[in-house]
Amino acid sequence: MAPRLCIISAAARRLFTKPRPRAGDLAAAGAVRFYSKDSEGSWFRSLFVHKVDPRKDAHSTLLSKKETSNLYKIQFHNVKPECLDAYNSLTEAVLPKLHLDEDYPCSLVGNWNTWYGEQDQAVHLWRFSGGYPALMDCMNKLKNNKEYLEFRKERSKMLLSRRNQLLLEFSFWNEPQPRAGPNIYELRTYKLKPGTMIEWGNNWARAIKYRQENQEAVGGFFSQIGELYVVHHLWAYKDLQSREETRNAAWRKRGWDENVYYTVPLVRHMESRIMIPLKISPLQ
């Protein structure tokens, strides 16, 4: 049987052929307690109940950076297998223009294809400098951008599904900066038990020092809109062997095992993606 081909419309071909920017231009919480009339039974049960300290502020206020008002959007696009190359070409033709246009308060942080994990998937990370007002300003302007609307129409024909989240960055991580390649990237996603985000952040604020010797720490984020109590840690490595050696080295450092001991019970589900950057990605 002949392989399926991704049919590219004339409109999409026009987008491909428009001038592209040069590569150099892209450069926590709740508390749970059980009480009983039987004081002895209550005391005994309290030994086994995981307590989380009550907080007076939202975890987004306590954990995010105070000196910036950056908001991030992460997009996951599941692409028809026969359309992945065309999807990448279309993306590389259009998205850099938004990144470079100063009229749009948004910038590309990274663009990847998933190598190990969900196949035929693209992941995009955007930064909105100015928080929610910047996001809304950008969205309103895009409604009147004919080229972007044409791009979305063509892109929709290539997708099986898509989803996104709005994120804030942890205060103890460095802000993601463009980096030269070649690198592979690992996106480790943790779905936490509700009410444990503060505890997660406190432990990682102490533990991040064990994971910075090879400059592998790129960024750390937690969800605000979309699926909640989700954490994303983004790492960069030269290759898979470097990843293994770097992670093994962390286990030889006193204190890293303690972080794992205290954070593992907070996790409901975790996932790892190994990703390859697209040509337009500022993170190479």
Curated annotation (Swiss-Prot):
Record-listed N6-acetyllysine modification sites: 65-66, 73, 80, 143, 146, 191, 193, 279
GO biological process: mitophagy; sensory perception of pain
Ribosomal protein in keyword set: no
Keyword Mitochondrion: yes
Protein localization: Mitochondrion matrix
Keyword annotations of the record: Acetylation, Autophagy, Mitochondrion, Phosphoprotein, Transit peptide, Ubl conjugation
InterPro entries according to UniProt: Dimeric_a/b-barrel, NIPSNAP, NipSnap_domain
Family: Belongs to the NipSnap family.
Description of post-translational modifications: In response to mitochondrial stress, the precursor protein is ubiquitinated by the SIFI complex in the cytoplasm before mitochondrial import, leading to its degradation. Within the SIFI complex, UBR4 initiates ubiquitin chain that are further elongated or branched by KCMF1.
GO MF annotation terms: protein-macromolecule adaptor activity
CC annotations in GO: membrane; mitochondrial inner membrane; mitochondrial matrix; mitochondrion; synaptic membrane
Protein's recorded name: Protein NipSnap homolog 1
FT transit peptide: 1-35
Function of the molecule: Protein involved in mitophagy by facilitating recruitment of the autophagy machinery required for clearance of damaged mitochondria. Accumulates on the mitochondria surface in response to mitochondrial depolarization and acts as a 'eat me' signal by recruiting proteins involved in selective autophagy, such as autophagy receptors (CALCOCO2/NDP52, NBR1, SQSTM1/p62, TAX1BP1 and WDFY3/ALFY) and ATG8 family proteins (MAP1LC3A, MAP1LC3B, MAP1LC3C, GABARAP, GABARAPL1 and GABARAPL2).
Organism in which the protein naturally occurs: Mus musculus
Modified residues (Phosphoserine): 129
Quaternary assembly: Interacts with CALCOCO2/NDP52, NBR1, SQSTM1/p62, TAX1BP1 and WDFY3/ALFY. Interacts with ATG8 family proteins (MAP1LC3A, MAP1LC3B, MAP1LC3C, GABARAP, GABARAPL1 and GABARAPL2).
Motif extent (SIFI-degron): 2-15
